[in-house]
């Protein structure tokens, strides 16, 4: 008889600990077993975290396991990463385990599901690498052959050939007997990148992992990967948890995108997880972007990442010309429409040449909020507290947080007035206006309302790629890595949407969005044109984006960050407290603040801010309050340790308040 410590598959903070069981079966760390649990001895799944342990209680009272799952098991590396995630993010063991395990049932023999079964493979042979690509690969190959863990940041302008560098690196890694993970920021991009990879490496070597797969598809892909049948995994951020062994490289394309930071529990950063896993395998991390995050670029300047620059587009295709349009002048001239005169005239010319147009607005819906003109009341979701967005097609107010729809009242619920009006502009309104201007043209829209699943996304992208759609209107989905050859014009309908967000990253996000969407123009050999409309066209985020000058933007932004002591010069830790009782949430947040102040080292320079109500709380009669800690570099782990200690106190006190840690959140409002 030997003894093992397991984590029970029971989603409760009060059972989030090790339980000791005995067994005479062949059980090892990472196995999934069935165990009798609690007084009723109900059979529960459990995960073996430690084997061959010395029991801390009388062996006579220790229960024995019932069985071992013959198909699914985790590796030592996965278990170790789960333990690290629990400490890092203040989550339950089970929260981390669920990231690594499949959620579904096996297919019947011979009926495995392939999420990319229709992919024929897009073969793109590069005749000759550019000198910049060749230099990049020489630098990366040295790390691959050296078998040491290293980190690279590829700063390459749009269409500079970063994907070819990725694929040749992966080929090198696979030739050395290791495996690879290729991540993209949006599920919408997996189809295009999968086609290219199948064309290069063959379907049998590729697996796909993302949250839009069915449970059966995800299970079957997980099993193929775990059995070693796939050497390359492609996916969105979920792919970083692929059950690969001997990982040689993890690549994050468009590394600056906020989607690499999970906004659900566990609130992990994909880069953090990648680095943790690669340390175990001595693999390399590659981050690629035309607009690297300020944090990543600063790490490159500090020597934490090796910087590789691709300054020229492949085949020396010129970068598109960017024009800034002052919408204040349009108003003075009497133009109150969505299109400036310049955007309209250029749209006509582009369509006459037989080229396509992309119109970008990072707001979906028809109108962005519904308000009473009499008293100013803004209609909000009764469950989430988020202002409702009007969707004309559905004639409803929609909460973009929980997805629920509500009939728009005829009278104001606050004052009884009939003056209910719709304000702001979303992609649905842009589509309607564009159809009025160009009724004979084929117009498509790509946002979360028109593309609710991977199949719909692929259909819209394919239609535009094949030239069946003349004008594509979209949110940030159209700005991320899509490669269209016949786009002659990109119009940014309003650059002020992201610029006016009350967040310290707003200028960075604006620069990135404008630069990335501009990169969709002129990829087929001809110089494209980008028209950016704004009421603040002199903002440095827009002027530097118009000049394709990342370095100037970075130099200006990093000075502001340093002066304001924002990341990368500090770390932000947001601690959320959620409860059905609002007073309990407030009180617990206040107690945490007081606890951290008592733990605080004199002179460490940390700021611990008072509890605030989150504007994004989800769930009926559920309240979320948070405290924010801004701590100097080097003190982050200390404060995470103290926060976890406070969480243990809550468990001991049987508190009903749930606590979550969010390290360097992408939004603090």
Predicted regions and their residues:
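Intrinsically disordered, low-complexity basic tails and flexible linkers associated
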Residues: 22, 656, 667-669
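Long, charged, helix-prone linker segments
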Residues: 102-106, 660-668
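Solvent-exposed, membrane-proximal periplasmic/extracellular interface segments of envelope transport
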Residues: 55-67, 612-614, 619-631
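A common structural junction motif
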Residues: 593-602, 644-657
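Terminal, basic amphipathic appendages of nucleotide-handling enzymes
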Residues: 1-153, 159
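Short beta-strand elements
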Residues: 599-614, 655-664
